[in-house]
Amino acid sequence: SDISFEVNKGELFGLIGPDGAGKTSIFRILTTLLLPNSGTATVNGFDIVKDYKQIRKCVGYMPGRFSLYQDLTVEENLNFFATVFNTTIEQNYNLIKDIYVQIEPFKTRRAGQLSGGMKQKLALCCALIHKPVVLFLDEPTTGVDAVSRKEFWEMLKRLKEQGITILV
């Protein structure tokens, strides 16, 4: 019920706790997808209730269950998320390039036909497509093989080096 923490810019911060402790709820509150029952919180200096529109523009969120459109192709998913944030793949390609080159050979494949590791990479690209300053990753390596898990943490390290604040 009482929780308080501060994450510095460019930090990789892990929120750890048992199942049912409220980690996902905290992420949903901080990404303005869920209203808190009480208390206050800010993300990137913005109040989560009053400034929710500004927060949505500056955060990326990758839920525990990938929020991909299974019937859309890799490229269609990326274009959809880019359009939602009024941007394009090309505008922010430098941010997703390291990840995108790994899924590009599958760009015409439907998301539902991708392996767990490829879905994870696509979901991360979609969360990054609008160049967020804060990235929320809810259990990002669940159900992913050891090699993909290691690659994923390497990608996060590179994102951190680019100044993105990451909460896992």
Model-derived regions: residue spans:
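ABC transporter nucleotide-binding domains
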Residues: 3-168
